[in-house]
Amino acid sequence: MMARYIAGSKYPILLTAALLAAPAFAGELGASSCTSLNLCPCSDVATTSVSVQQSSMQSMSQNAGQMTMSMPNMKMTAPTTFIEEILAHSAAGTAAEPNSTPHDMLMAQRGAWTFMFHGVGFLNSQQQTGPRGGDKVFGTSWFMPMAQRDLGNGTLTVRGMFSLDPATITGRQYPELFQVGETAFGKPIVDGQHPHNFFMELAAIYDWKLAKDTLLSFYAAPVGDPAIGPEAFPHRVSASEDTLAPLGHHLQDSTHIADDVVTLGLAYKIARIEVSGFHGREPNEHRWEIQAGAIDSWSARFTLNPTKDWSGQYSITHLTSPEQLFPSEDTLRMTASVTYNKPLRDGAWGNWATTLVWGRNRNSPDAEIFNSYLAESTARFANHNYAWTRIENVDRTNELLLGENPIPPGFQERFVARIQAYTFGYDHEWNFIRHISTAFGGQYTLYTAPPSLDPIYGSHPMGVLTFLRFRAIPSEK
């Protein structure tokens, strides 16, 4: 079935072609597997993990928490403080991660500028059981180029993030049982997940060093990620091999692609507080466009990185008219999360990342409250093996009962059920192509729901996803 689909469609091949083009890019940039990145006066083309400690650079020893390689007058180490982690900007938007979080990046130095690139793509085959289950071959991807330089008493970062999802996910959705929260072509998407926008982020960030331990940050993006929630699921290391959106996505981190975003952040030692203004309406089915609008929504987030392996956040946001089908309805969202990351044997053997997330939406004016809980964990062991799990407990609304039907007149969202999802997966990667990791794997998801939903979903709904995964990697990995 997969071979027949690929032969008859150009779209999944676009995803593969884009990832295979990365070696040419890597030939220009060099590569780095790093914990975090920032400006450095490195050679014209360098394979490195960069730290803000430019003045003391001598040599570099590679492991998941620290990279080393002999280079003239340079020592490049991983961030040792939260301020350095912020300056790295290896996460989407202004989200924070534990300092020890590893990232694969391609890098180059051109004059005062440091250029970076990282990205990943999946070619997926999804099969699900039950009356509502669907089968589909589709691609998911994101690519992030970034550039940094010193400017005045601070650092300027410009960044783009793009996805081929609008081309590789036909019909503006892929099947995912019990997923709700989006619309396309005037109808709700039920038991399916929408593609990401082609423009996921176009942002400029200026970090002004007020003192050794104090940083004032300005973030502006016609499309970007406001200060809401944890690191969005496509970019979390704890979800690096699970390409499907969590069922709680629209109660936790769905605003990671928002329009007209401005954020102000102040960090001191291990803590940071941020406030954002942005346009609250979620994107519609026109996924190739930037859908600008007035800044009508706000958020605030407090982040704490007490040690190099831990990061936590709490955020609150008011979303003005986020849903196209419910234009008179606003949402108050609260989230809290904790992420733990641990390099295994100092990174020589692998890495283990775990995230816990709680998200809550309260819709107004009816004051309905919906909660979601997530625990996910991914372990990379023996360097080329990945095992992961995601466990969720989420509230679902009566949108589930609509199926593919339009919203009827006078419809009001109400709680209908609490759903549990249990996912377990494994993949193994090979480095057939320079600077490209290729992995083949799969995952199994079992859902539990109240017996009242058995006539719609069957008694034991489940899904199986198999995939090929491509990721830009350093040549030495």
Segments (PLM) and residue ranges:
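Outer membrane beta-barrel transmembrane domains
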Residues: I316-F326, A353-A367, S372-E376, H384-I433, ...
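Residue-level signature of outer-membrane beta-barrel architecture
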Residues: A108, A147-L151, W208, G265-Y268, ...
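Repeated loop/turn-to-beta-strand initiation elements of outer-membrane beta-barrel proteins
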Residues: F115, G152-T157, K212-L216, I270-E274, ...
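N-terminal periplasmic/intermembrane-space "pro-region" immediately following the signal or transit peptide
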Residues: F25-V120, N124, G133-G134, M146-T155, ...
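Residues that define the transmembrane beta-barrel architecture of outer-membrane proteins
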Residues: W113, D135-F143, H196-L202, H256-V262, ...
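Surface-exposed coil loops of outer-membrane beta-barrel proteins
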Residues: I169-T303
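Transmembrane beta-strands of outer-membrane beta-barrel pores
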Residues: G121-T129, F162-T168, A220-P226, Y268-I270, ...
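Outer-membrane beta-barrel "beta-signal"
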Residues: F424, G458-K477
